[in-house]
Amino acid sequence: MMNLLNKSLEENGSFLTALYIIVGFLALYLLGRALQAFVQAADACCLFWYTWVVIPGAKGTAFVYKYTYGRKLNNPELEAVIVNEFPKNGWNNKNPANFQDAQRDKLYS
């Protein structure tokens, strides 16, 4: 770094070398400000999409689910079917399935 500075001082003089250094720092400053503006714009964009698209979309989906499929799933008859008529020995068991009759408290094979 000092070698480069000494070479610039010899070839261009102290005024131009100082001017080049100042212009270099000014360029770095402007690059930083441009990057800051870009990050701020990206942050505002993400905040906009999150506030106006993601949250309302999730709330809308939850609302629709709650008042359509959610109501249907909270049906006691459906729960009785799922609990009582599903094979008690799992999906992949080779043995015959065991079913339970809820009204008569009997097991069927």
Curated annotation (Swiss-Prot):
GO biological processes: disruption of cellular anatomical structure in another organism; viral budding from Golgi membrane
Top-level lineage group: Viruses
Keyword Magnesium: no
GO cellular component term of the entry, any: membrane
Location in or out of the cell: Host Golgi apparatus membrane
Subunit record text: Homooligomer. Interacts with the M membrane protein in the budding compartment of the host cell, which is located between endoplasmic reticulum and the Golgi complex. The cytoplasmic tails of both proteins are important for this function. Interacts with Nucleoprotein.
Summary of the function given for this chain in its UniProt record: Plays a central role in virus morphogenesis and assembly. Acts as a viroporin and self-assembles in host membranes forming pentameric protein-lipid pores that allow ion transport. Also plays a role in the induction of apoptosis.
Protein name: Envelope small membrane protein
Organism ancestry: Viruses, Riboviria, Orthornavirae, Pisuviricota, Pisoniviricetes
